[in-house]
């Protein structure tokens, strides 16, 4: 059976793994999921990630990050979904928690944070909020 929203599945796996204090979480890999994991690593929300498995069925393994026994990611939620895509122009990209969190945006120049998209002057699809 095919998955209707692989990005929501990725975010849910991360959220569920952190609730039970797992150190790593594994999921099927794709280019978009790897790009999201790269943004999460660059922003300091995860310790790292690696792509394992065969070329036919690659697996993305994310190493979660904790601080003083609590997950670094307090909130991670999907914004744009298959039934209702959310696109924002370069001037209307939202801030998450007045800049304390990040919005991950898929643009014509790749997947990036809201701050980087504003700096580059590009808009795109708002994939998720992370705080």
Swiss-Prot record:
Report the SUPFAM superfamilies cross-referenced here.
Answer: Ribosomal protein S8 (SSF56047)
Q: Which domain of life is it from?
A: Bacteria
Q: Which UniProt keywords apply?
A: Ribonucleoprotein, Ribosomal protein, RNA-binding, rRNA-binding
Coiled coil start-end: none
Could you provide one GO biological process annotation from this protein's UniProt record? translation
Any GO CC annotation of this UniProt entry: ribonucleoprotein complex
Task: Name the family the entry cites.
Answer: Belongs to the universal ribosomal protein uS8 family.
Question: What does the record note on quaternary structure?
Answer: Part of the 30S ribosomal subunit. Contacts proteins S5 and S12.
The function of this protein is: One of the primary rRNA binding proteins, it binds directly to 16S rRNA central domain where it helps coordinate assembly of the platform of the 30S subunit.
Protein's recorded name: Small ribosomal subunit protein uS8
Which gene produces this protein?
Answer: rpsH
């Amino acid at each position: 059976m095919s998955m209707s929203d692989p990005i929501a599945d990725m975010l849910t796996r991360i959220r569920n793994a952190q609730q039970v204090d797992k150190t790593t979480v594994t999921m099927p890999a794709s280019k978009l999921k790897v790009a999201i994991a790269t943004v999460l690593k660059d922003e300091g929300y995860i310790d790292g990630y690696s792509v394992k498995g065969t070329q036919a069925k690659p697996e993305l393994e994310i190493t979660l990050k904790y601080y003083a026994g609590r997950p670094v990611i307090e909130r991670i939620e999907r914004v744009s979904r298959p039934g209702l895509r959310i696109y924002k122009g370069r001037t209307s990209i939202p801030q998450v928690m007045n800049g304390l969190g990040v919005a991950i945006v898929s643009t014509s120049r790749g997947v990036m944070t809201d701050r980087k998209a504003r700096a580059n002057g590009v808009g795109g699809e708002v994939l998720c909020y992370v705080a």
